[in-house]
Amino acid sequence: MTSRALTFLPFDTVWKMRIDHPYSLLVKEGDLLWSCGQCPLSGAGEVLHSDELLPQAKEVIGFIERFLGEIDCKTTAVTRLTVYYVKTNDGDAAALDRLFQERFGPQVLITPITTPHFYYEGMLIEVDVFGSTRQKRHCVYVDEATGVELSVVETDALAWANLRVIHLPEDENPFPEVLERLMRRAGLSRDGLLAEQWFAGDERVGKSLTSMAWSPALESCGVLSIEHDGTDLLAEMTFLKNASVSRMSAGAALCLPEGLEIRLAKAENLFHVTACDNSGARGIVEQTRRIMHALERTLTDSGLAFHNVRKTTTHYVSGNSAEGLHENMAVRNDYYSRPGPASTGLPVKGFPNSNALISVTLTGTVHG
């Protein structure tokens, strides 16, 4: 990033959640931007078009366009939209993909991710926005033998990559080789991998990833179980183009309590942290407390702090009540002050390769 100008779009100027919090609707630093989860809510926090997926999606699209304009950005700045939704019919993923591409263009990565439910009754969709104001290039790379697809949007500094596997072969051993071939064609390397999140469309797929030995994330909370909607496996990855990423596992390095797993990836300007409690011995609120305390220690040990965070994402296993979100959210909120980062927190089906009930990821800037 050549410019370090930092902009926060306040949350409460638009609509209110049913819990006080320090987060921002959008955060822009230099050429990069991140959003909180964009929801189909009224100014009073009531669900719009209750239980209607596509009308809610259209409302969210309108919000995204409006909020980007409020920080002097165009929709051409968008690189990736992570579309969390409750599946109502087979083919919802394809319908959402078409709708968002019609409005944002084919050069934007769309990741449709099913969630079992949301925290407000009648709400069916929430969308994360990632972007850059730099000039971008979009390419799709397909492995002809397997149909595995890698879609990439890149600037001269960063690449956002979406992996899509419609049918994962029963023999999963060749899959890492397929992925490496596609990455080489795209000019990407694991040395530059800053962030990754995997989404498995069934239990077999999720558990099979542990044997691939491609990334430590596949053996833990880096894999989420989602309901199948046309795709066996999805992954979101972010790469640095011209820099290597240093990695550390903070558990042993900082003598963290047993069961806590913290993985930190850090480069010259950006960092990404993933945290979870694999012990399986505690409830979601206590896991959240342990995670946030460990994250604070990890950031401090790395010369960082929570004010460096620009985007935080929380996935958790819970019921479909607001309390399920608000209880763990209240713990996380205490670590930030206004104006805080963009934030998303929502339920998931599960973590097939971990005993965790919740995972927390942080993305931020080293010099923030």
What is the predicted role of each segment?
Residues 1-62, 66-79, 85-310, 316-368:
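N-terminal presequence-like segments and the immediate start of the first folded domain
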